[in-house]
A protein has these predicted regions:
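FAD-binding core/adjacent interface of flavoenzyme oxidoreductases
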Residues: 1-13, 79-155
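Beta1-alpha1 glycine-rich phosphate/pyrophosphate-binding loop at the start
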Residues: 5-83
Length: 155
């Protein structure tokens, strides 16, 4: 019975931190709320934007059919979350139950969900990767840079 009490206390008063504020992190946070979690929910994401849909970046956005700012993911429900966007999680202290952030602050948690996704594989030759006209397309900022370059026309 003590376990049931501690789970109920976590559900009501606990602190859950989600590292990764993209599709997986958003859907996990929504599910927590749908399943009755009423405690503190903190979303941490290294990009300064709320969760957005990535596939349109390489399709509709590049074709000019959809502006970058219209790729925000729809919400299934209100999250009542504390958003820490534009600041990367840099370290995890599991003993202290604390996530360190790039801005020097930290966030304490009772439960932690890591949903950071993946990154594009870097170009194998760093010198070539830095050449003018070489692009990676993963984020809204990447898409905006590429759209601007395409609009400028050939060089």
């Amino acid at each position: 019975m003590a376990l049931d009490g501690s789970l109920e206390r976590l559900r009501r008063e606990g602190r859950i931190v989600v590292v990764g504020a993209s599709l997986a992190g958003l859907r996990a946070a929504e599910t927590l709320r749908e399943e009755g979690f009423t405690g503190t929910l903190t979303m941490i994401g290294d990009e300064p934007y709320e969760p957005y849909d990535r596939p349109p970046l390489s399709k509709q956005v590049l074709l000019g059919l959809v502006p970058v700012d219209q790729t925000v993911l729809p919400r299934r429900r209100a999250l009542d979350a504390r958003w820490r966007l534009g600041v990367a999680a840099t370290a995890l202290d599991m003993a202290a139950k604390r996530v360190a952030l790039a801005d020097g602050t930290s966030v304490e948690y009772d439960r932690l969900l890591i949903a950071t996704g993946v990154r594009s594989r870097p170009w194998p030759n760093e010198l070539e990767a830095g050449l003018d006209g070489v692009f990676v397309l993963r984020t809204t900022d990447d898409a905006a840079r590429l759209v601007n370059r395409l609009r400028a026309g050939p060089r």
